[in-house]
């Protein structure tokens, strides 16, 4: 592919297109990948469709002001995002250790973007072009639009609008608001006059002219009072709906952060249009010499069938970004994309995914949402299925069947995550059977996350009984279709509410599973999630009940070690945890013991595991022993895929 297949990145590109001045310049923390899995590509192509000229400055050197000047000053302004992931999550692990790789950068190497990329980029743009409007968006800006707890600073930070000095913030999925804002700018409106576009947040000196709004506790209150923080979050959480959501206001000293209600979800026709835009569907050629951009490998032959999720897991901030209402593409749109993939030169016959945040949520949760919006005080599938929930996999199944019939398609996988409780609510087993028969390759990854019901309740996840029923049914179906396939559970340690007792309960369950999972993630307090609010305040903001928070680093290490108790290097921590919890009954050589009395030699320990001694593995281990190696993912990937 040539540079002309991409949006312009240099003055040379502008000359070839006879462009003197760009309308907009997108500055992003990711490398430039022109694929609909990347927000920069979507916003760039949407604006191009509307008749605007758009350039890309990808991963500029933040220590060199000239990098921000290389495309000149745009006519209407700069659009700034950190990339597909919050820059701090991208750079640091849950234990705040620096990551050494970056799937969104050339060659997978780190160091191409600064911490708090949105703030840094905005400050540099202001330095280069003092009066140029700046609009921020993407996940980093979206989830930091109000005063928020910042795990890396261990303090409450102001709205990112204050820290970045940006003129406007677009939150959530930005196609509709960016078109409306850009057209207003084209018609001559000044950026500081744009205050009525849904899906935007701005700063106001006074709020006398506002109507029908809710003022939440101020930055000064939430940064000094945890009850006020919890109260502010609760209001934000309940008002993220395009039909019933109110304008929200939060005072920051003498100014006000104002969030307009969310944009209505995209219609099916609008979704189809977005995904039919002329993407190059790969990374820019300038990265070829550095080994390309690793992130494209996972998505190049994957299809986004829908957006949104009504699962409402507490540790996921999707409600604040994509929303609870499902927005799906038509089958024709998806089939066209699948057919197009088969003509790509490096297509090997495998479509890696057809899904979204949760693969089997292909339609709205209920008919009520269409007229009244999402319910304010209850969830669709938690703690149990709502009576109005539409449980039906027929349309999704028919789509998968059609894709399977496309010439040159050998296999269609589902990797974006199956919500197992929703699957169990379906009385028709047809989808479950075909899922096992056609859409997994030896193993299915699911996310029970924990096994203690008190922790699951705080996570917003179904009870242990639901997962146990799913596991039994999964293996029963595989037995009937004569397939020897396994489950790989995602598990989380140190979530709010998880004490040593709960971690030991999970360790005992893992022992019965028969192998040590590598898919273990420490809870990561990222901006915008309900669980992060619990972590910071020690309060469940929805119930106002106190929550136990494992913040001590030693205890967090113990909890993680318990989930991988059979790993030799974890022996001392596991033993210390069991003694601290007064569970010495789990130390010894009995069938229920997690570890022996004495720490074995490392080689002997491995040999014991393989021989099934000490009961660290059950009879399934020989079949299952290679699962962890084949599925090793970095913790960023695990964080994104949880359902």
Swiss-Prot record:
Residues 598-643 are annotated as: Disordered. InterPro entries: Elp3/MiaA/NifB-like_rSAM (IPR006638), rSAM (IPR007197), rSAM_horseshoe (IPR023404), UPF0313 (IPR022946), UPF0313_C (IPR024560), UPF0313_N (IPR013704). Its cofactor is [4Fe-4S] cluster. [4Fe-4S] cluster binds at residues 309, 313, 316. Binds 1 [4Fe-4S] cluster. The cluster is coordinated with 3 cysteines and an exchangeable S-adenosyl-L-methionine. It comes from the Bacteria. The keyword Lipid biosynthesis does not apply. Residues 295-566 form the Radical SAM core domain. Gene3D superfamilies: tm_1862 like domain. Residues 610-621 have a biased composition (Low complexity). HAMAP family: UPF0313. This is UPF0313 protein CLD_0573. It comes from Clostridium botulinum (strain Okra / Type B1).
């Amino acid at each position: 592919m040539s540079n002309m297949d991409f949006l312009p990145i240099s003055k040379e590109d502008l000359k070839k297109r006879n462009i003197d001045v760009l309308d907009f310049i997108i500055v992003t923390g990711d490398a430039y990948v022109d694929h609909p899995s990347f927000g920069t590509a979507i916003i760039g192509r949407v604006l191009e469709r509307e008749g605007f000229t758009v350039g890309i400055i990808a991963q500029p050197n933040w220590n060199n002001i000239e990098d921000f000047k290389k495309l000149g000053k745009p006519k209407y302004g700069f659009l700034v995002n950190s990339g597909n992931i919050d820059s701090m999550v991208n750079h640091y692990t849950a234990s705040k250790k620096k990551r050494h790789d970056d799937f969104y950068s050339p060659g997978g190497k780190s160091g191409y973007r600064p911490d708090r990329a949105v703030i840094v980029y905005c400050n540099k743009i202001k330095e280069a072009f003092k009066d140029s409007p700046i609009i921020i968006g993407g996940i980093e800006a979206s989830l930091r639009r109000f005063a928020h707890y910042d795990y890396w600073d261990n303090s409450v930070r102001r709205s990112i609008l204050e820290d970045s000095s940006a003129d406007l913030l677009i939150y959530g999925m930005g196609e509709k608001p960016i078109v409306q804002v850009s057209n207003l700018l084209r018609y001559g409106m000044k950026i500081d006059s744009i205050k009525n576009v849904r899906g935007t947040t701005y700063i106001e000196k006074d709020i006398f002219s506002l109507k029908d709004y809710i003022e939440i506790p101020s930055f000064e209150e939430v940064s000094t009072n945890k009850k006020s923080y919890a109260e502010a979050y609760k209001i934000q959480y309940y008002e993220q709906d395009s039909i019933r959501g109110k304008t929200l206001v939060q005072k920051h000293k003498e100014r006000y952060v104002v969030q307009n209600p969310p944009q209505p979800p995209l219609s099916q026709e609008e979704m189809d249009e977005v995904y039919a835009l002329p993407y190059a569907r790969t990374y820019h050629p300038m990265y070829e010499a550095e080994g390309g951009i690793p992130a494209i490998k996972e998505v190049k032959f994957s299809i986004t069938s829908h957006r949104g999720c009504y699962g409402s897991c507490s540790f996921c901030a999707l409600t604040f970004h994509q929303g609870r209402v499902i927005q799906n593409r038509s089958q024709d749109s998806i089939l066209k994309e699948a057919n197009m993939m088969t003509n790509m030169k490096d297509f090997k016959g495998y479509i890696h995914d057809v899904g979204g945040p949760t693969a089997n949520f292909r339609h709205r949760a209920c008919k009520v949402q269409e007229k009244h919006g999402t319910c304010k005080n209850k969830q669709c599938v938690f703690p149990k299925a709502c009576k109005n929930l539409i449980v039906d996999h027929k349309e999704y199944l028919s789509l998968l069947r059609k894709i399977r019939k496309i010439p040159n398609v050998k296999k269609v996988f589902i990797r974006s995550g199956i919500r197992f409780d929703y699957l169990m609510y379906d009385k028709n087993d047809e989808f479950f059977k075909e899922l096992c028969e056609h859409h997994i390759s030896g193993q299915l990854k699911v996310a029970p996350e924990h096994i203690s019901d008190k922790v699951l309740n705080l996570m917003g996840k179904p009870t242990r009984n639901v997962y146990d029923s799913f596991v039994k049914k999964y293996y029963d179906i595989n037995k009937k279709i004569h397939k020897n396939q396994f489950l790989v559970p995602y598990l989380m340690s140190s979530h709010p509410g998880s004490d040593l007792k709960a971690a030991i309960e999970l360790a005992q369950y893992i022992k019965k599973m028969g192998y040590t999972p590598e898919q273990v993630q420490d809870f990561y307090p990222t901006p915008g999630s309900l669980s992060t609010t619990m972590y910071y305040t020690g309060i469940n903001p929805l119930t106002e009940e106190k929550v136990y928070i494992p913040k001590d680093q030693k205890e967090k290490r113990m909890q993680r070690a318990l989930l991988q108790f059979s790993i030799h290097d974890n022996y001392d921590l596991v033993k210390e945890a069991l003694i601290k919890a007064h569970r010495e009954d789990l130390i010894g050589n009995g069938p229920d013991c997690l570890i022996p009395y004495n720490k074995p030699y490392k080689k002997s320990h491995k040999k014991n595991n393989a021989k099934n001694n000490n009961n660290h593995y059950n009879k399934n281990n020989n079949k299952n022993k290679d699962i962890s190696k084949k599925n090793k993912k970095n913790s960023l990937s695990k964080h994104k895929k949880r359902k």
